Amino acid sequence: MESKVEQGVKNLNMENDHQEKEEKEEKPQDANKREPVVALPFEAGEYYVPRGSRRRFRVRQPIAHYRWDLMHRVGEPQGRMREENVQRFGEDMRQLMEKLRERQLSHSLRAVSTDPPHHDHHDEFCLMP
């Protein structure tokens, strides 16, 4: 079982390295996609070229992409493990949503109800005969 987990981790590391190499190869292409440089007159006979920001390349979101990849890749040997992880992730999300819903309902019901909060010994303070 551990060998399968270790193998899955190695495969993920290899995929991440491969994606990083692809990103490095894509950077020169992104640099070519920039807007054309406009030369502005600086002084007589000289031109000033604005440099602008260099962070114009596309920013990737690896975490969201990894989750999508995790959910949709089932045909591989590690597919069953990933499917179990997705099911566990779904169960955790359902539990969190139920807890959140219960807390929201308890707060809203407390605000709507006119009854005072009941204690174990509330009869001691009752003024009714």
UniProtKB/Swiss-Prot annotation:
Zn(2+) binds at C126. Residues 118-122 are annotated as: His cluster. The modification Omega-N-methylarginine is found at R51. Keywords: Apoptosis, Cell cycle, Cytoplasm, Metal-binding, Methylation, Nucleus, Zinc. Residues 1-38, 108-129 are annotated as: Disordered. Regulator of mitochondrial apoptosis and G1 cell cycle. Regulates the level of PP2A regulatory subunit B and PP2A phosphatase activity. In absence of reductive stress, acts as a pseudosubstrate for the CRL2(FEM1B) complex: associates with FEM1B via zinc, thereby preventing association between FEM1B and its substrates. The histidine cluster (His cluster) and Cys-126 mediate zinc-binding. This is Protein BEX2. It comes from Rattus norvegicus (Rat).
